[in-house]
Swiss-Prot record:
Entry keyword annotation includes Ribosomal protein: no
Keywords attached to this entry: Endoplasmic reticulum, Lipid biosynthesis, Lipid metabolism, Membrane, Methyltransferase, Phospholipid biosynthesis, Phospholipid metabolism, S-adenosyl-L-methionine, Transferase, Transmembrane, Transmembrane helix
Keyword Disulfide bond: no
Full protein name: Phosphatidylethanolamine N-methyltransferase
Molecular function, one GO term: phosphatidylethanolamine N-methyltransferase activity
UniProt similarity note: Belongs to the class VI-like SAM-binding methyltransferase superfamily. CHO2 family.
Reactions performed catalytically: a 1,2-diacyl-sn-glycero-3-phosphoethanolamine + S-adenosyl-L-methionine = a 1,2-diacyl-sn-glycero-3-phospho-N-methylethanolamine + S-adenosyl-L-homocysteine + H(+)
InterPro entries (alphabetical): Phopholipid_MeTrfase, Phosphatid-EA_MeTrfase_fun
Residue intervals annotated with topology Cytoplasmic: 77-85, 189-199, 253-264, 372-375, 439-451, 531-849
Leading EC class: transferase
Function of the protein: Catalyzes the first step of the methylation pathway of phosphatidylcholine biosynthesis, the SAM-dependent methylation of phosphatidylethanolamine (PE) to phosphatidylmonomethylethanolamine (PMME).
Cysteine-cysteine disulfides: none
Length: 849
């Protein structure tokens, strides 16, 4: 594309001129011949500016334009509107094919073989000595393009061939534009437009929207030409090259291929103004032909000359995973046309296929109403979105989903594959229900007009294109949020900035729901489709805003840079004001959602140590820990072996000293161990069972010996006192804040309560350095608890209070991770196997951070 560079160049007068900022060019076949291209003018100035010299072909082009206008008027007056439409529609098709097919073929051969340039050289068209008729005409024609004092003989054949090629391009493009515009003018409902242009009704809104689209189209063309100049406008790099790279500025920073994409938005604006579906279909045909020209002519040439900005050249993470991992294959991806990466040996792929078939067959057999199907589609979208967002949120913050599978004996790759299956299944179900819902509305309800249905399908096509471009850029790994599950596989911690991400940071926010809003048009603005589209958009926005963006900051250490659209928008004052407004609204939403809807961090979510300390202090302040509930006597219930931090480590025996007045004592008094949070506010009566965690205080009680853990018992004239122990046979093996309660006789009436204390597992996080040390520590702990047999096996029957859940909590306390009880059972509670698995999980999770 046209840029300037500093170089030493040979000026047309043959003198050496150093360090002048000018665009330097050279023929494609030779980089040694350097020349300074003379000034050229755009198509409109060349044809209609009376101050510029006109060539013979330019005069012919102007004459044909005037002739077509006269023909249109005459045909409309004498042959009628329908015949005139046919005449100019036929002309438009001819000139459009001349453009996309004719010029396309010429440029294809010029790109590959320089056919036009070689033809000019072979027939010496620009040779000063050549005197044949064709040479004289060609030299006469392009001599008008040079300023006075300049000569075509000072420039290489490539340049002169391009100038001649431009004349024929001007002829085809101007006739293409003129015949299309005349066809549209004839199709306009002039009376309807004039009568409703000032009214706020459907016709008035449609007309003004169309006018805005046409004006936007004009701006796109003007801005595009100001960026690429005549050099790229007329495909100059098919003939010669300038010392410059591809330019991404202005409108080229906003949309991919703006000359071919939004550069034709005026077509659809004119279709809206006319309200004629025939005009719309003709516009779509012309636009599709233009895209074919882009795909098969221009894009291959750009990639050949400038290289591709695609990431295809780099081996994707998915390709590396397939090569390096024996049990990994690319995930199933449901596309608009079917399934991609279907693996006949993966059961999950068949589940997705069977689900789709079941939904379609079920709807065919049951034949639900449109409203019923809409309710199902809306409910399914809400439920599946909440599930997906929950998984992603918890995975981002704590690797929850991966940990879930690791705990059950699977690896992190399998966990990621299961997420891929869940995500694709949800997407497939949502889209198949949406398609069926649209079909049922089309069949059973009033469908929209040809125009609304067609525009709805165009929005659907935009979403399909957007999804295709996103997938092409980020591949399967990005499509399935791979950086949430396997961030350790990312070699370069750099966000994508190519493909569609060059223009928009989050294209799925806008174009990713275009097709969903297209169903609103297709279903004639059905309320159910409005609800579906709004719900879809809301969940899409919420996922990007509150889950994806914070996670990207964690993984890549930075937020996405300003997109091309944002950079271009902020060049203009109204753009800066608009962005400022959006930022303020965004901040207000953040403040509202996080201060009003999201609850503040509760005590239960705080740090465990700080949390428990605050609860203990609260209990100590709220009431005395030793209470006289019988009168004014002296009562005492103390824990002997508690440390200064109010902590006892499992499975240490706990010794409790007690004392009550003789009047309050009964031989069947007993002491129970309870979690503070479970006893509630009632301090006079214990309303929950002790679950076997209790002991009698007197050997003369009527209780069994299993619950007589008496160390000492005595009395005097005033008091009865003693001590008991809570050993591993009646101790709790669950961490928490506990208290002892002294109960009167064989009842749950509370006589006194000990001060609360923390019951915790021993802490070895800092001392355990390898798996062998963890195995030894675990076995030692289990021996102390009396549940280890054969020096390697955990026995569930040794202590009914020490369960598989207890062992799971031990690992979690020691290593911040654990395995499921189901996995433990599969290993027959082999401590070596279980502990090695825990260590492996810990290493995997640490590696994923």
């Amino acid at each position: 594309m046209a840029t300037s560079c500093e170089s030493t160049v040979l000026k047309p007068d043959g003198k050496l001129n150093s360090h002048v900022k000018i665009p330097i060019a050279h023929p494609r076949s030779s980089s040694t011949i350097r020349f300074d291209p003379p000034k050229t003018h755009d198509m409109v100035r060349s044809l209609f500016d009376p101050t510029l010299k006109k060539s013979f072909l330019e005069c012919c082009i102007t004459a044909t334009i005037i002739g077509n206008v006269i023909l249109c008027y005459y045909a409309y007056q004498h042959l009628g509107a329908n015949t005139t439409k046919i005449i100019f529609l036929s002309q438009y098709i001819f000139w459009r094919l001349s453009y996309n097919l004719g010029i396309g073929i010429v440029l294809h051969y010029q790109s590959h073989y320089e056919s036009l340039t070689n033809f000019a050289k072979k027939h010496t068209l620009f040779d000063k000595k050549a005197n044949n008729l064709l040479s004289r005409f060609v030299k006469f024609e392009i001599s008008a393009k040079y300023q006075k004092g300049d000569s075509l003989y000072r420039y290489p054949e490539e340049w002169n061939t391009w100038l001649l090629f431009r004349q024929f391009v001007d002829l085809i493009l101007m006739q293409d534009f003129t015949t299309y515009m005349l066809y549209v003018v004839i199709s306009l409902p002039h009376n309807d437009i004039l009568n409703n242009i000032t009214s706020f009704n459907s016709i008035g809104i449609r007309v003004w929207l169309g006018v805005l689209m046409v004006l936007f189209n004009i701006w796109v063309k003007i801005d595009a030409h100001s960026v690429v100049k005549d050099y790229a406008w007329y495909w100059g790099d098919f003939f010669f090259l300038q010392d410059a790279n591809l330019v991404f500025d202005g409108v080229f920073n906003v949309f991919p291929h703006p000359m071919y994409s939004i550069g034709y938005i005026g077509y659809y604006g004119l279709s809206l103004i006319s309200g004629d579906h025939h005009v719309l279909f003709v516009s779509i045909l012309g636009h599709c032909l233009q895209f074919l020209f882009l795909k098969y002519v221009e894009t291959p040439h750009i990639e050949r000359i400038y290289g591709s900005d695609s990431s295809d050249e780099e081996e994707s993470i998915d390709d590396k995973m397939v090569k390096q991992l024996d049990n990994y294959s690319k995930p199933l991806v449901t596309t608009f046309l079917g399934f991609k990466n279907f693996d006949k040996f993966k059961p999950t792929d068949y589940i997705t296929l069977i689900t789709v078939a079941s939904i379609v067959i079920g709807c065919t057999i049951l034949n639900p109403s449109f409203v019923t199907l809409s309710k199902i589609a809306l409910t399914t979208k809400i439920v599946s979105s909440v599930i997906n967002m929950t998984i992603l949120y918890k995975q981002s913050n704590s690797k929850w989903f991966t940990s879930l599978y690791l705990k059950n004996g699977y690896n992190e790759i399998y966990a990621y594959q299961m997420w891929q299956f869940i995500y694709n299944l949800h997407s497939t179900i949502n889209y198949i229900l949406l398609v069926l819902q649209c079909y049922y509305h089309f069949v059973k309800c009033d469908s929209g007009s040809y125009n609304t249905i067609t525009f709805g399908l165009l929005l659907l096509a935009i979403q399909i294109w957007c999804n295709t471009e996103i997938f092409h850029s980020i591949k399967e790994f990005g499509w399935f949020y791979g950086d949430f599950f396997l961030p350790n596989l990312i070699d370069k911690r750099k966000l994508k900035n190519d493909g569609i991400y060059r223009y928009l940071n989050n294209p799925e926010r806008v174009f990713g729901v275009a097709g969903i809003w297209g169903t609103v048009l297709i279903n004639n603005f059905s309320n159910w489709n409005l609800w579906l589209a709004t719900t879809w958009t809301m969940f899409n926005w919420f996922t990007v805003k509150f889950i994806e963006t914070p996670h990207l900051l964690k993984v890549y250490g930075t937020k996405p840079t300003s997109s091309g659209f944002e950079k271009t928008l902020t060049k203009y004052k109204f753009g800066k004001d608009f962005k400022s407004l959006i930022d303020k609204v965004d901040q207000l939403l953040d403040d509202y959602l996080f201060t009003s809807l999201v609850p503040k961090q509760s005590v239960a979510e705080a740090d465990r140590e700080g949390d428990w300390e605050s609860i203990i202090n609260m209990l100590l302040i709220r009431e005395q820990t030793v209470k006289n509930l019988q009168g004014t006597g002296h009562f005492n219930l103390d824990i002997v072996n508690i440390n200064d931090e109010n902590t006892i480590r499992i499975p240490e025996e706990i010794e409790i000293k007690w004392a009550v007045t003789n009047e309050a004592f009964h031989k069947d008094d007993w002491i129970g161990l309870y979690k503070v949070v479970e006893t509630g506010e009632d301090r006079l009566t214990t309303k929950i069972p002790s679950q076997g965690h209790w002991s009698a205080v007197s050997s003369s009680s009527s209780y069994s010996e299993d619950h007589q853990k008496i160390l000492h018992f005595d009395s005097n004239d005033h008091f009865t006192y003693g001590s008991i122990k809570f050993d591993k046979s009646i101790l709790c093996f669950e961490e928490g804040i506990y208290e002892f309660r002294y109960h009167s006789a064989n009842s749950h009436d509370v006589v006194m309560i000990s001060k609360p204390f923390k019951l915790l597992f021993p802490q070895f996080k800092e001392t355990v350095k390898d798996v062998d040390q963890l195995i030894a520590t675990t076995k030692q702990f289990l021996k102390q608890c009396g549940v280890l047999i054969n020096d390697n096996k955990f026995d569930l029957n040794r202590n009914k209070y020490f369960t598989g859940k207890t062992l799971q909590n031990w690992y979690k306390s020691t290593m911040d991770t654990d395995v499921s009880v189901v996995y433990m059972k599969r290993t027959n509670f082999d401590i070596d196997i279980i502990t090695k698995k825990v260590w492996q999980i810990k290493q995997v999770l640490d590696n994923l951070e």
